[in-house]
Curated annotation (Swiss-Prot):
Coiled coil feature spans: none
Protein name, per record: Adenylyltransferase and sulfurtransferase MOCS3
Sites of Phosphothreonine modification: 59
Keywords: ATP-binding, Cytoplasm, Metal-binding, Molybdenum cofactor biosynthesis, Multifunctional enzyme, Nucleotide-binding, Nucleotidyltransferase, Phosphoprotein, Transferase, tRNA processing, Zinc
EC number per UniProt: 2.7.7.80, 2.8.1.11
């Protein structure tokens, strides 16, 4: 009995030691990243690229301006003074993706004099269905540069500064002060908090948009005396597992187009002093029923950590650490299973080619299964694994040791969750997942297999 207890202590101790080693490694990686970010920010500053050069101040419209903007100049509430304000304004757009492209397009064409474009990413074919400034021929180049090319064709009078870098806690405070209005067109929680805190500290209106699947949201933070900030509404970040991105959940391009265009609209209203800015309210767009709802959101939180009269946060922090998520929407590779609970795609391919009896469960949603599947795969969405409703369907295979079970998904994360769950019910059955999922299949087994 005592020996057994000592053994279990030893096992527990070994586990804790492993955990400590993992945490130490994570800490070292963060330290390294911090050094890289600092270096990148220094380089950027050294290149003199960060500062928007002193803006020209215009006092009148040119003939070309009058001809170009005539249809908005004749608007009673807009007029010459509105156009002059736009011409002298500077707007920073963070993210030149689904939201940022239409927002930039409407701001440049309306005559916003100075646009800053921030995006660290490059154009990919899967962006083109909604990121309307980019083109097939510009795949592979910086999104900020690609957007600049398109925008200058639209309006050569617009001055455009590109920052083809990740906006982070070092460069944000150098870039943002030069701009009048900031547009959050990013796709991740860490960047939302970073932009919020920077805008709150620097007192810049932040036009925040988001879109997923068929739905979108829009509001303006940090606007005026009483306008709440993002932290007033969301004091703590959501748990990482509750966050879905466009790459996983999907999105319709016209939804991002709708919200992006409205972000441009709110920015123009802020600059020109037009209408009623969407602060303290949130627009909820349900694309499937085409309904726009405007809900009142709470005002400034008296104890908000960043925008209250006695803030706890007076400088930018490490937002990836704070949110437990990276400042991008790419999935982190999970490490849930032991190596013996996984099989690489080459070994699986060999076994399947030799026609060894087995069952291959594909745990992606049906819409994704319809796009492409591995030979003989059976679609059992992850939800059916987790609620155990698959058990009855595969009772025969689960009873027979002759049927090793393999689980596959798109990138090898959900498949691990599925195996971990199935193992709790069938600990003695051989159940393994395909490492790195179908992406690895395309890379290592069949380059003609579609990737998405
Ligand atoms: N901190 C940041 N600094 C600079 N750019 C950012 C930052 N966070 C997000 N972005 C950019 O914001 C954009 C968000 O747009 P969107 O989600 O439509 O594009 P995406 O990430 O290319 O899409 P997908 O998920 O389909 O690959 C991306 O281009 C992304 O690179
Ligand atoms: Zn606040």
């Amino acid at each position: 009995m005592i020996a057994a207890t000592a053994d279990s202590f030893e096992i527990e101790k070994a586990k804790l030691c492993r955990k400590i080693a993992e945490l130490q490694a994570a800490l070292n990686a963060k330290d390294q990243k911090l050094r890289e970010l600092q270096l990148a920010a220094d380089n950027l500053l050294a290149e003199g690229e960060v500062q928007l050069a002193p803006r020209d101040h215009y006092t009148e419209l040119s003939n070309d301006d009058i001809a170009r903007y005539s249809r908005q100049l004749i608007l009673t509430d807009f007029g010459v003074s509105g156009q002059m304000k736009l011409k002298n304004s500077a707007v920073l757009i963070v993210g030149l993706g689904g939201l940022g492209c239409p927002a930039a397009q409407y701001l440049a064409s309306a005559g916003c004099g100075n646009l800053g474009l921030v995006d660290y990413d490059e154009v990919e074919p899967s962006n083109l269905h909604r990121q309307t400034l980019h083109t097939v021929s510009r795949c592979g180049i910086s999104k900020a540069e690609s957007a600049r090319i398109a925008l200058l064709e639209l309006n050569p009078h617009c001055r455009i500064i590109c920052y083809s870098n990740l906006l982070n806690s070092f460069n944000a405070m150098q870039i943002i002060p030069a701009y009048d209005v900031i547009l959050d067109c990013s796709d991740n929680v860490a960047t939302r908090y970073l932009l919020n805190d920077a805008c709150s500290i620097l007192q810049k209106p932040l036009v925040s948009g988001s879109a997923l699947k068929m739905d979108g949201q829009l509001t303006v933070y940090c606007y005026g005396e009483n306008g709440p900030c993002y932290r007033c509404i969301y004091p703590v970040p959501p748990p990482p597992e509750a966050v879905t991105n466009c790459g996983d959940g999907g999105v319709l391009g016209a939804v991002t187009g709708t919200i992006g265009a409205l972000q441009a609209m709110e920015a123009i209203k802020v600059i020109v002093g037009l209408g009623e800015v969407l602060a303290g309210r949130m627009l909820i767009f349900d694309g499937s029923s085409c309904q726009f709802r405007n809900i009142k959101i709470r005002g400034k939180r008296p104890n908000c950590h960043v925008c209250s009269s006695q803030p706890l946060i007076t400088g930018l922090i490490d937002y990836e650490l704070f949110c437990g998520m990276n400042a991008n929407d790419k999935d982190n590779a999970l490490q849930l299973l032991e190596p013996e609970q996984r099989i690489n795609v080459l070994d699986y391919h060999k076994l399947a080619t030799e026609k060894k009896s087995h069952l291959l469960l594909d745990v992606r949603p049906p819409a994704e299964f319809e796009i492409c599947q591995l030979p003989d795969a059976v679609n059992v969405p992850l939800a059916q694994i987790l609620d155990d409703s698959y058990v009855q369907r595969f009772a025969q295979q689960l009873e027979s040791k002759e049927y090793p079970i393999f689980v596959v998904c798109r990138r090898g994360n959900d498949s691990q969750i599925a195996v971990q769950h199935m193992k709790t019910r069938f600990p003695d059955h051989s159940i393994r997942d395909l490492e790195d999922g179908m992406h690895a299949w395309t890379k290592l087994v069949d380059q003609n297999f579609p990737i998405y």
